[in-house]
């Protein structure tokens, strides 16, 4: 072996690295845009680009000293840095959530440990004015050794932290060689068991920083808000000798506010200190992210930084920022891109954060590791609170084999392996300090999180103690402190916020009833996997009911997947866990974001945006026109933030649309009243829709952007949908003769315009032919199954055990009669699966009118032994030529009984193709709830369905069996039919893939109900 085994030594996490420090990019002059221009500094040399690379299946296969000068790299290939070697065909991708990808044997890793050798030659001229050189790696997974010009520089680990080496003595003028050996696994792997794809290599930026001999090395900026002024304290330490340092503060227009010089600061970590007073300061918050510029000047070097003035505290278990009780409207975010993997560039980062702002998020958690430094600078600029999390997760220790697998024993053993093991105190403390030190000057960071899902013990007690001792201006949290052993008492004194993952509303209420002394934070909630989440509004309501509940962070921002080009059918091909032949994986559990891998929004993101809209209508008096609004922003006056657009729709027809500029203040968390002058017709289903639009553009959002809406049902003499009412009325009867013929199996009804065949054995229609054209591809069905959503993953097995996926209808008795209207057919029907008792008993009455219209009324009784139904309704397989549809209901995108807040009532004209929501893991999608009628159309033929009560429908080219069977969307095959599901109801969506059970009010648990539907056939819309 050509390197020492530091990678299995808990005592050696770093060798020859510089002490942790705040992030900055020094220059010889004041820098402009810090993010965009970070590599434009004349003191920074970027090493990103093409490197020579050779992969080895095992560290033992690497026998040659590739790092030596003159080594022949002709056998190497070329890769881009930053990058991960799995994307270049080396090794393979693996997704695992909890379980380790290696045996649980810390600190040891498999002897066949893959590694990658990187080499880059570069020219370098030692600058006379800045002769010292520091080599920075911002992210390498999992550990690495470094050589320059054949000389060993050092070793480091902690994948998502910056490692800095002093390479002054090994660089030379002219050509130099930089060599890096990266190992896939190290002892740090046991602390990096985050829920993500596992990738390896140099995945973040590499660069040299040139500096004078004597410079400001580290500094820490804190702020205190006093009456009519802010106090900025800057503490600093030096590399080399302390030198005179001037500090200048500029406002956002780059007007000088104040200047100071450092004075000695005896007896502290930092040797020097300066205090700057700002009169009538502009405070930083996510809604008004005002930033000052701080410039630190020494001879030969300038450090430029942006600072925000804000103050954080907890009082009476309520979290305040700048004296305002806040709510985190947050999301968890991983570094993930389907093409580049862990490698996230500036534009990718900007897009994520811009979409968050547009969707009304005000906070992001860096789950579960530090992000690149400019992520936090962008959050400062765009306005997002941040929970900054250390690179620490040992969740896999929970998966150890235990003879006694009860939860108490699992929890005890989980802690003992690592989190309550004194041998891991240095590693845990190191990861915490690396996180805190680098980003301690970022105003966006409100909370330091010690990590994720490690259990609790002495390691975190020490990390929390250090964090509170070093930075008393921010708060701390650590969710896994919840998991404890009964073997000893734990120290929780340095945890400021009690955080929980996926608590039910009842669990939240229990916490509130205890009169807690710490704020409650939902560090993860509303698991957004696939078609979901469906419970955002419920959590919103309880979050805003209690000041102690300071908000939450949805899990998570994006689906994780690996893009593999186009499939043979032309569809984009995304792969997830298990698709790479890996033995240990967690399937599609990584597909749990609010956006697709390419950042196309899921409907769940649209739902979030409207649930967390900036304002809400509290009440509307139709008589006086008084509309009461409540401001749900934390800091801004509504009249300065939004303008309104209101419209009146009746039966889907737009009657009125106007813009309204707020003239009076509506302060944060307060209510205000405006007057609207609207006219409402005497009949029709009428709605007032009030939309909220951004009044002024920002650096990330365009003026006029819609930030959400409210919809109010208006009162009138006849509030029924008049089109639906007309469709329900029996049409004028024709004199056409109706003929009936009957066999043991079928009842056939014929006129000069239609021919229908009713199956007496199923109680459903076998054929529907109008004007000589058959409408159905296959017989009509009763339908209680849906392709399980990701959030059905726990109830799904109950449904399968109950036979819902294979149930069939049978009729026990069918008889008919003819009257003046036409034919009435009476059937007694059940729904059952093989080997299981019947689920449903149904008394059905069908009517065939002489006009050709068909209606049905079903009285349904469910066996109470069975679980909640996925759905109940009728399924039609229409000919595939039915490509267009109109409907009145909740749209334009999919809606369900608990996932419908981003939809509004209207008349929508669309296509079957547009109804499909193309989740990467196929599942139920594209349904619409609260509908009055549906019309499907092909050339010269329409099929209309209408009910006396609002119903749900789904129209798709894909059968629910196909959606259930296939694992990836690119594998889906169209049925050839236009499949129409007309449902009395569907089960709700929820977030039970990782969250609580679907709430009772959204479960389809009715034991008796009545379903009716009417079908009309014609030649025009």
Regions found by a protein language model. Name each.
Residues 87-89, 184, 285, 677-684, ...:
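Beta-strand/loop-rich accessory regions of lumenal/periplasmic or secreted enzymes
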Residues 148, 229-263, 626-631, 635-659, ...:
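Beta-strand-rich binding/interaction modules
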Residues 1-39, 96, 190, 211, ...:
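Extended substrate-binding grooves/exosites of carbohydrate-active enzymes
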Residues 194-215, 569-621, 625-628, 632-640, ...:
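Catalytic cores of secreted or luminal carbohydrate-active enzymes
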Residues 172-175, 235-313, 686-725, 729, ...:
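Extended acidic/polar, glycine-enriched regions
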Residues 262-279, 653-683:
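Intrinsically disordered, low-complexity Pro/Gly/Ser/Thr-rich segments with frequent PxxP/GP/PP motifs
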Residues 87, 92, 99-108, 157, ...:
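An acidic-aromatic loop/edge-strand motif
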Residues 3-15, 33, 37-38, 52-56, ...:
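Accessory beta-strand-rich segments of carbohydrate-active enzymes
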């Amino acid at each position: 072996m050509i390197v020492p085994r530091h990678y299995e030594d808990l005592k050696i996490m770093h060798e020859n690295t510089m002490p942790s420090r705040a992030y900055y990019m020094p220059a010889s002059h004041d820098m402009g845009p810090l993010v965009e221009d970070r590599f434009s500094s004349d003191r920074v040399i970027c090493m990103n680009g093409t490197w020579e690379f050779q992969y080895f299946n095992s560290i033992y296969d690497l026998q040659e000293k590739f790092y030596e000068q003159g080594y022949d790299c002709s056998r190497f290939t070329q890769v881009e840095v930053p990058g991960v070697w799995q994307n270049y065909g080396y090794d393979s991708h693996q997704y695992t959530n909890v379980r380790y990808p290696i045996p649980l044997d810390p600190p040891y890793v498999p002897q066949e440990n893959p590694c990658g050798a990187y080499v880059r030659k570069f020219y370098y001229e030692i600058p006379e004015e800045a002769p010292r050189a520091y080599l920075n790696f911002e992210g390498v997974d999992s550990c690495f050794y470094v050589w320059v010009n054949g000389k060993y520089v050092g070793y480091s680990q902690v994948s998502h932290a910056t490692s800095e080496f002093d390479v002054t003595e090994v660089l030379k003028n002219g050509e130099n060689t930089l060599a890096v050996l990266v190992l896939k696994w190290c002892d740090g792997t046991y602390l990096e068991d985050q829920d993500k794809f596992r990738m390896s290599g140099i995945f973040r930026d590499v660069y040299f920083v040139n500096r004078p001999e004597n410079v400001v090395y580290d500094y820490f900026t804190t702020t205190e808000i006093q009456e009519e002024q802010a106090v900025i304290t800057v503490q600093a330490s030096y590399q080399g000798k302390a030198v005179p340092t001037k500090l200048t503060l500029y406002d956002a227009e780059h007007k000088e506010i104040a200047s100071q010089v450092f004075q000695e600061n005896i007896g502290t970590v930092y040797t020097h200190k300066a205090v700057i007073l700002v009169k009538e300061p502009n405070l930083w918050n996510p809604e008004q992210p005002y930033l000052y510029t701080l410039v630190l000047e020494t001879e030969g070097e300038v450090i430029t930084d942006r600072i925000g003035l804000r103050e954080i505290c907890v009082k009476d278990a309520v979290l305040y920022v700048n004296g305002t009780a806040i709510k985190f409207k947050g999301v968890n975010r991983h570094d993930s891109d389907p093409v580049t993997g862990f490698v996230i560039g500036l534009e990718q980062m900007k897009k994520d954060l811009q979409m968050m702002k547009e969707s009304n998020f005000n906070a992001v958690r860096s789950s579960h590791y530090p992000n690149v430094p400019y992520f936090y600078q962008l959050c400062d600029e765009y306005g997002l609170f941040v929970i900054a999390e250390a690179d620490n997760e040992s969740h896999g220790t929970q998966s150890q084999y235990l003879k006694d697998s009860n939860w108490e024993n699992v929890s005890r053993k989980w802690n003992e392996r690592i989190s309550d093991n004194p041998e891991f105190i240095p590693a845990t403390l190191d990861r915490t300090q690396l996180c805190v030190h680098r980003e301690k000057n970022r105003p966006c960071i409100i909370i330091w999180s010690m990590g994720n899902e490690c259990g609790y013990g002495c390691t975190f007690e020490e990390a929390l103690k250090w964090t509170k001792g070093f930075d008393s201006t921010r708060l701390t949290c650590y969710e896994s402190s919840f998991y404890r052993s009964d073997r000893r008492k734990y120290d929780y004194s340095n945890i400021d916020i009690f955080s929980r993952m996926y608590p039910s509303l009842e669990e939240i209420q229990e916490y509130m009833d205890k009169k807690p002394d710490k704020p409650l934070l939902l560090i993860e909630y509303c698991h957004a996997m696939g078609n979901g989440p469906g419970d955002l509004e419920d959590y919103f309501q309880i979050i805003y009911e209690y000041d102690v509940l300071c908000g939450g962070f949805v899990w998570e921002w994006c689906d994780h997947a690996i893009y593999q080009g186009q499939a043979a059918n032309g569809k984009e091909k995304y792969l997830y866990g298990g698709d790479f032949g890996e033995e240990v994986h967690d399937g599609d559990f990584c597909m749990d974001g609010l956006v697709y891998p390419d950042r196309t929004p899921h409907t769940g993101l649209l739902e979030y945006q409207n649930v967390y809209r900036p304002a809400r209508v509290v009440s509307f008096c139709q008589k006086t026109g008084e509309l009461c609004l409540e401001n749900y922003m934390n800091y801004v006056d509504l009249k300065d933030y939004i303008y309104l657009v209101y419209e009146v729709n009746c039966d889907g027809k737009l009657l009125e649309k106007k813009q309204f500029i707020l003239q009076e203040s509506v302060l944060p968390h307060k209510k205000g009243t405006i007057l609207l002058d609207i006219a409402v017709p005497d009949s029709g289903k009428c709605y007032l829709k009030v939309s909220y639009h951004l009044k002024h553009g920002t650096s990330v959002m365009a003026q006029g952007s819609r930030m959400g809406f409210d919809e109010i049902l208006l009162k009138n003499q006849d509030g029924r949908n008049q089109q639906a009412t007309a469709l329900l009325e029996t049409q004028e009867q024709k004199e056409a003769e109706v003929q009936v013929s009957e066999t043991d199996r079928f009842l056939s009804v014929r006129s000069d315009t239609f021919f229908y065949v009713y199956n007496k054995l199923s109680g459903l229609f076998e054929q529907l032919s109008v004007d000589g054209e058959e409408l159905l591809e296959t017989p009509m069905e009763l339908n209680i199954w849906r392709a399980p959503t990701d959030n059905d993953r726990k109830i799904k097995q109950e449904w399968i055990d109950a036979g819902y996926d294979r149930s069939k209808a049978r009729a026990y008795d069918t008889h008919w009669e003819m009257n003046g209207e036409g034919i009435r057919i009476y059937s007694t029907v059940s729904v059952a699966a093989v080997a299981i008792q019947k689920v449903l008993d149904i008394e059905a009455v069908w009517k065939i009118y002489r006009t050709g219209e068909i209606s049905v009324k079903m009285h349904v009784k469910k066996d109470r032994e069975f679980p909640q139904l996925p759905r109940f309704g009728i399924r039609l397989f229409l000919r595939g030529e039915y490509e267009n549809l109109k409907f009145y209901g909740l749209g334009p995108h999919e809606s369900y009984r608990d996932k419908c807040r981003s939809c509004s009532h209207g008349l929508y004209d669309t296509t079957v193709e547009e109804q499909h929501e193309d989740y990467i893991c196929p599942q139920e999608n594209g349904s619409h709830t609260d509908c009055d009628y549906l019309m499907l159309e092909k050339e010269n033929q329409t099929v209309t369905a209408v009910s006396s009560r609002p119903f749900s429908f789904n129209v798709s080219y894909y059968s629910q069996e196909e959606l259930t069977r296939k694992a990836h969307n690119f594998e889906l095959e169209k049925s050839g039919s236009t499949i129409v599901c007309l449902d009395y109801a569907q089960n709700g969506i929820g977030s039970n893939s990782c969250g609580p059970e679907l709430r009772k009010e959204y479960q389809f648990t009715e034991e008796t109900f009545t379903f009716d539907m009417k079908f009309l056939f014609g030649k025009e819309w």
